[in-house]
């Protein structure tokens, strides 16, 4: 939120698109890859910077975001049904820069080594990166929440949302850890 005067909504939208948010996919099933809309007030812009306000994403878009941050380029998801993925190619278009990818990986690694996803340090090898989140919704005070976790370990990216969950580190972390271990 403190960056609202230095990071414009257009900058935020460009960064999100560079990580796959809003991309158009043809997977043979309906997909929603997220949206970072224009913000017509400073309050809405500030909320957008932390993924609140009118920003909307899906577990698929967040898994792509995490994988794209880790790979340094937009990762295109593919539905797998017993086929060889050797010919899979990255998506074309604007992508995250090498410097941006490095910064994101450093910050996401710190969430594991020093922050709210500490249990992921138990994965072998100890290289996981991730981020937790809490999405507020409704008009109640305090608002209801959904808990989020995105993580990347080795060649696997995962996004988890638990509807009406507690904080991502409390509700989502054990689920993501179990998924990445198996």
PLM segments and residue spans:
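Short, gly/Ser/Thr-rich active-site loops of penicillin-recognizing serine hydrolases
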Residues: 88-92, 174-182
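Short amphipathic alpha-helical face segments that pack within enzyme cores
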Residues: 58-64, 171-178
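Beta-lactam-recognizing serine transpeptidase/beta-lactamase-like catalytic domain environment
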Residues: 1-164
């Amino acid at each position: 939120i403190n960056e609202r005067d230095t990071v414009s909504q257009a900058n935020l939208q460009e960064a999100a698109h560079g990580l796959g948010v809003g991309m158009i996919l043809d997977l043979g099933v309906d997909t929603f890859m997220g949206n970072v809309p224009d913000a017509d007030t400073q309050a809405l812009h500030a909320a957008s910077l932390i993924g609140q306000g009118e920003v909307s994403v899906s577990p698929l878009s967040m898994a792509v975001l995490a994988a794209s941050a880790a790979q340094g380029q937009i990762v295109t998801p593919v539905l797998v049904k017993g086929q060889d993925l050797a010919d899979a190619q990255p998506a074309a278009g604007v992508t995250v820069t090498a410097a941006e990818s490095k910064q994101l990986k450093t910050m996401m690694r710190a969430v594991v080594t020093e922050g709210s996803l500490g249990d992921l340090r138990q994965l072998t090898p100890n290289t996981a990166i991730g981020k937790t989140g809490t999405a507020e919704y409704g008009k109640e005070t305090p608002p209801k929440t959904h808990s989020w976790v995105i993580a990347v370990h080795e060649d696997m990216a995962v996004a988890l949302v638990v509807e009406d969950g507690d904080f991502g580190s409390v509700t989502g972390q054990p689920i993501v850890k179990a998924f990445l271990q198996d």
